[in-house]
Swiss-Prot record:
This is Chloramphenicol acetyltransferase. It comes from Streptomyces acrimycini. The keyword Transferase applies. The lineage of its organism: Bacteria, Bacillati, Actinomycetota, Actinomycetes, Kitasatosporales. One of its GO terms (molecular function) is chloramphenicol O-acetyltransferase activity. The active site is at 195 (proton acceptor). It is an enzyme of class 2 (transferase).
Length: 220
């Protein structure tokens, strides 16, 4: 699958409020952080039970929707090594091959309409459900971010240690197994963030917006 690769827009460093923060966490104290939250998916799961659409792709689309709202989660480094922002980013997501106990990484172009996205992504999942290559479509585009799923376990913490990953500004999401508590259905979600790209405020806003989106799943 091919998609036009846009040109990221450079950030005006003279007016960027986070210039000093970016420099600090990119050069002086390079670091990432992980935030794990429980998202209430009670209404979301109930709506999916009445829908033929796939819950995993609905989760992926919801993540892509809130990610694309905010420049800090569409950041990259341009060819000069300066911070820039993609006009749109696409989700790359895993599919598990139970026979080999390995997974493949797929990607689908983001569309603000869930139905359009699902119609593109669902056949990809079906086609590559037994994939033996890590990237059966070839490498994802540079304006992609990663989503993986661990539907076998519910967790309260998850961290990725990325050696020398200081150029990776895109967020990384990990989804877990639903758990029920006090009649509510909860989804564990871990978000791995480069601190140069976003602070705790930005990540909290992202997860809160995801909660709001899943609490009113009329878009399904």
């Amino acid at each position: 699958m091919d998609a036009p690769i846009p040109t990221p827009a450079p950030i005006d460093l003279d007016t960027w409020p986070r210039r000093q923060h970016f420099d600090h966490y990119r050069r002086r104290v390079p670091c990432t952080y992980a935030m794990t939250v429980e998202v209430d998916v009670t209404a979301f799961a109930a709506a999916l039970r009445r829908s033929p659409r796939k819950s995993y792709l609905a989760q992926v689309w919801a993540l892509a929707t809130v990610v694309n709202r905010h420049e800090e989660f569409r950041m990259c480094l341009n060819s000069s090594g300066d911070p820039a922002v993609w006009p749109v980013v696409h989700p790359a997501f895993t599919v598990f091959n139970p026979e080999r106990e390995t997974f493949a990484c797929l990607w689908a172009p983001y569309d603000p309409d869930f139905g359009t996205f699902h119609d593109t992504a669902a056949p990809l999942l079906a086609e590559h459900s037994r994939a033996t290559d890590f990237f059966p479509q070839g490498n994802p585009p540079p304006n992609a971010f990663d989503v993986s799923s661990l539907p076998w376990v519910s967790f309260t913490g998850f961290t990725l240690d990325i050696r020398d990953g200081w150029d990776h500004l895109a967020p990384i999401f990990t989804l877990g197994r639903y758990t029920e508590r006090d009649t509510r259905l909860l989804l564990p979600l871990s978000v791995q963030i480069h601190h140069a790209a976003a602070d705790g405020f930005h990540t909290a806003r992202l997860t809160n917006e995801l909660q709001t989106l899943l609490a009113d799943p009329a878009w399904l």
